[in-house]
Every structure is written in structure tokens, then in C-alpha cells.
């Protein structure tokens, strides 16, 4: 994250002896980009390197839909099966070397495994459900409309209080956009959200012994390891790198007399993509405004939108839970009669919630996307 935070008990100085109840605590530097990036210091009851058993390695190559035409896509996640596990069995739909977009439907209950994504930061957008996120940093309660942002390398698990549907983004260097931060890391006036909107982890320490199964994910697969001490044995931590949650309903959308580009709603930025959030807001209010998106030839980008709730005015035939992929080089925009209908909406409010991922690198669609794809969608501007 962008500001300093601390939880639990800490020594007065870093890298010094820290005793608790007569026992030496084990300090871990949890950091990005070697020793030059953001980091936190965690203090464990036990060495975090302690592995009791090395388990199974399972490869995990995303199957590509190799004969897919280069066209727009509409995917209906309502047709997807349930995931047996949110980490091992999430369903990858759209991907490239630096981005994976997945969806997961998970039943109520506790996950039996602990997770650690070694290669990618993760964003879980909670389309529906209630979840208790548990990690080495502590716990965060998340619910419908929340983003849960997890730095790569974080050890965590999830407890589902209700059946849940999750739109999942994996990528490198997912951060709060630099334009929102001043030189001290504080979110500036006019940014899409403020520091106090973020839900931060509350530390809970587990001093327990047993058999704990941890799955480490890389781009190539999953490695299972077994531990004899609980991985959440942290008694205190501080720093600038930790998970957090943010509700889309706490966002502060920028509106204008004339239509604002999607980048006005940038929520997170990564190496090769941005995440934008369309939330309920005032439509454009110039007396001659066209309060709907213009036609767009996004030559250098691929645009993925997840439609969560409300009415997305520029689209027809879109249901909650649908995903569209608008290809770079193909023009996209409002469907027939949508522009005319929007003219009566000047100065009124919309109720849409949608998540947009725009990437600068071409994406592939998976074999799972093929199963839920609407092949008529590219023609919908002609046939609507």
C-alpha cells in the first residue's frame, strides 16, 4: 500500500533481538523488487522457513482457445460450473503473460488449504457473497462490492460466510495509481478514493501446532508443502506492503459537463494494465452533451469489462455477471439506438457497477471461455 501501517507487538528497533515470553521472535522481511521496493517486517513465533514435508507438484497451463477468431467476445459467467477450490480451481478466461482474469463460484464454508501466489498480485472483486480473509497480516471482512487486494507472496486463506462469486485479476505490480499520491504517499485531493476508505487487516495470532497444507502458485503450477506450525503465527508487523480492501460504493467518481474517458475511473494500476471502476454517478450535464460513451478504436489496448450490477446504458443484452472483451483494432461503442436514448438522461443518475481491465498487450481467450461465449456478440451492433 502507499502508507505506513503497524499491528501487534514490535521491537523498538528493526533487526534487533525481540523476546516474547522468553522466546526469540523470528523477523521476516516481506518485500518487492529485492531490497529496493515496498516492504513490511513481520515477527513470527516460529521460523517461517520451517517445512515439514514437500508435497505434490501440479502443473497448471491455461488451455488456449487456439482457433478463436480475432473479434469481440461476450462471456456469460452464469453458465460456469462451481469451483471446487478458489485457488486451485478458479476458471481462467482471459490471459496474457502479465495478466490472468478468472472467475470462481464458491460454496459457503472454510477453505481447507493455505495459499500463496508467488508470481502475481491478486485482486478479488466480490460480485456476491461474504468472506473473511485471513492472512499473516491479519483478517479483513469483505462483502459484495468489495475489492480485496493481495500482494504476491502473501500467505492467506478464505472463509466463505455465504456462497460467493468472484471476479479475479492476477498481475504484476498492482498499486494505487501514482497520480493519486503525493510525494509522501498520501492520497491527494481529487483522487478516486482516500486513505480512510481502505479496510486494513486486523492482526490475529495463531500459536498452534498441527498439519497445515500450503499451496504455492507459480505461472507454471502449484507446489504443495506441509507445515507443523500455523502459518499465521505473526505477533506483530509494520511497513508499507500489506493486503487491503476497498468498496466500490466508497469511490468518489469524477463527473463533468461532457463525457469523461474510462481512465477518469482508474482504481488500480499495474505494469501493463489498469483497473477502472464504473459506479453510480451523475450523467453528463452540458445542455448538448451526449451522456454515453463515444465509439472507440482502442488500437493499442484490449478492454475487458465485468458487469456486476445496474443498467449499463451503452449495452443491450448484457446480464449481471457477463464479461465483454473488446479487441484492439476493432471499433466498439454504443449499440444501435443507445445514443439517441441517452439524450434524455442528461443530468440524471445511473446505477451501474462494472469493472474494466484495459491492457496494453494482446490477450488470449481460454478453452473455458469458448464454452460460455456468445458468437453473435460481434454482430450485435448490426442486428440490435
From Swiss-Prot:
InterPro entries in the cross-refs: HgmA_C, HgmA_N, Homogentis_dOase, RmlC-like_jellyroll, RmlC_Cupin_sf
Keywords recorded for this protein, A-Z: Dioxygenase, Iron, Metal-binding, Oxidoreductase
Family as reported in the entry's similarity comment: Belongs to the homogentisate dioxygenase family.
Binding site residues for Fe cation: 296, 302, 332
Superkingdom per UniProt: Archaea
A single BP term in Gene Ontology: tyrosine metabolic process
Coiled coil regions, renumbered to chain: none
GO molecular function, one term: homogentisate 1,2-dioxygenase activity
Cofactor dependence: Fe cation
EC number: 1.13.-.-
Protein name: Putative dioxygenase SSO1533
Top EC category: oxidoreductase
A Pfam short name: HgmA_N
